[in-house]
Structures are given as structure tokens and as C-alpha cells.
Amino acid sequence: MWDRCSEAAPAGPPPLPPAPAPAATRALSWAPAGGSAPEIIGHLQENYYNLCVEKSQKINYFILHKLQEVDKEIEKGLEGLTLNIAGNSCLMPVERVTGEDFWILSRILKKNLYINGLDVRYNLISDVGAYYAARLLQKQHKLIYLNLMFNDIGPEGGELIAKALHKNTTLKYLRMTGNKIENKGGMFFAAMLQINSSLEKLDLGDCDLEESTVHLGHMLKENHCLVELHMCKHNIKNCGIKQLCDALYLNGSLRYLDVSCNKITRDGMVYLADVLKTNTTLEVLDLSFNRIENAGAKYLSETLASHNRSLKALSVVSNNIEGEGLVALSQSMKINPTLSNVYIWGNKFDEATCVAYSELMQMGRLKPDNTDVEAFVVDGHVYLAEVSNGLKKHYYWRPTYGAACRHSANAGFTLVPVGGHL
């Protein structure tokens, strides 16, 4: 059992924070280009600095700098803030957050009333940090957004976080992307989702889960709160998509389904096209990097033309679709008034495809920001070029300049908002 009163680590794994570093090391671990540490000017900064000294923990000046930014926002009277300590910043030096850093950070956040979002993506918090993240979810009743993607969290850390969410009633958005929680950790998340009544967006993509659709399918039959689910790189095959579709007949809440980078072929599209005939909640469907080919695209096109009027966005990027299937999708858009976003790059374009999508854009049926191609003419022939739009272009990386949250580059989140910055 976890000790809910003490902040010390348990006797077993995860281990206690390391012994105190030498004083010279503790004094400065990151500093701005000028070489001096930032001035301690705010409440969060002061708490963090003092707690590091009290616990003989090395001060991470990247964290200190980010707390300074939030302190300034708090001074302006702002609430509902996200503390962004992402470890993949291209604009400043970064010392990545470790599990021991997260131990200190979680202690100063657990009673903070101004912060309801925490982004620590691309750091090194591991299972040690996952333990303290789980405790934070138990104690911090304002947190609605937690981004832990790519943090070396394993099955044990995944289990701790999933179990913490059994009783949590505030968290709405969790990203576990890229943490290798494997099937063991995935089982705990599937079980949690049959109990949890608040989580609306969950990303378990690239977590080394294999054919997780049996358990997540059972979850979808029971859960009526989840709005967005990412299952990228789950090794889903046609039998897996059938299990998901069986669950979608009974689910009335899911609006965004991401099954990109799997092994779904045209046979799987038979099941999906059939469920789309009756499903009225699904609005965004990401099939990128599968292999549905012409036949799969035609199954979808027929349903979109004749039955479905709820789907708003479809991505079939890199699915080995040729002109026949791509033209069929374009024809369905002329009939279906709801489908507004279509992404097709990475397939096999012929001239008929180029003409068909050029005509959709010229007539205003397909807006330039709602697709990943644009038309141009050379010697009287129409061609398509790629543009940087998509459902989640800036999901795994940040541009070196410009905004990372352009609506056209991250259309999926614009189409299915949960609230605020989520």
C-alpha cells in the first residue's frame, strides 16, 4: 500500500532519491547563456529552490526557469495554467527532468490552485517519476492534463499510473505515448477505463502493446466518457479492427479514433465501413500508414456517400491506394456534406486523382487548410504537391520557429475539443 501521508519513497522500487550531490554540483545544473542562475522572484520558484536545498537535491535550473514563467502568469491573476517543462525544446538549453527532479516538482504542485496542466514530455522520469506522478494524481484535484510521453516509463510505472486513475475524478487528458508499458501495463489501463469516469482523451500509441484490441474493445463497451483514443503501433490486424468495430456498435462517446501505423488491410475496412453506417458519434478517423488499398478506400467511400453523416475528418495517408480508390473518396465528398477534412499524401496519384482533388478545391468543397495536398499545373497537366497540414503534424515534434499549434497542422484536436487547451 502507498503511504498517503509521507512523501518518502517506498521501501521497494522505485528507489529513494540518490545521495546528496556535492555542493558545487548542487549550486548550478543549468543556467542561461549569461552564465548566472535566474533570480528567485516567485512563489513556485522559491518553494522549489528551498525544497531542493532542504532535501539536498540537485537544483535543475531548467525547471526553475519554467517555474519563473508560470509565477509571472500567476502574478497577472491567471488561472488554469499549464506548466510546460518539455525536454525537446529547440530554443533554449535543456537539462531533462529525472525521476528525482519530478519528486521535488510533484511536492510543490500537489496543492497549487493555479496549475491544471503539466507537460513533461521527452524527459527521463522513468518508473521513479511515474510513482510520484501517480501520487500527484491522488492528491492534486485540479490537474486535468498530464503529458508523460517518451519518459522511459515501463510496465511497473504504467501500472502505478493506471491504478491511481481508478479513483481520480479530475484528469481529462493523459498522454503515455512512447513509454514501453507493454501488454502488462496496457492491461491495467484497459481495466482502469472500465472504472474511471472522467478521462476523455488517452494516447497509448507506441507503447509496445501488441493486439490490445480485445481488452480495449471490452473497455469501449463499458466506458461512455472517453472521447479520444490513440492506438498507434499496436500491431492491429484485421481481426483486431473487427473487435474494435464490434465495440463501436455499443459505444456512444468516442469521437476520435487513431489506429495509424498498424497492419490493417482492405478486409478490415469491411468491418469499419459497416459500423460507420450506424455509428453517429465518430468524427475523426486516422488510418494513416496501414494498407487498405483501392478496395478498402472504396468500401469507405460507399458508406460515406450513402449512409454516414457524422465523420468530419479522414486520413488515409500512405495506404497504397491508387487512382481508382482516391477518386472514389473524392466523389463521396461531393455527396457527403459533413466530411470536411481528407488527407491522402503518400498514395499513388495518377492524373485522374490530381484532377479530382483539384476540382474539389476549386469549387470550395475542400478547403486548402483541410487537406495535405495542393494542385499545380505544368504543361497543361495537373499535379498535387504536399503541404504541411494534417490531423496531428506537431504531435511528436515541435517546429524550430512559428506556432506549434496551428489549427491546420493539428486539425484533429480542433475538430474534437475537450475544453480549454485540450
Locate the predicted segments by residue.
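Leucine-rich tandem repeat or coiled-coil scaffolds
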Residues: 1-422
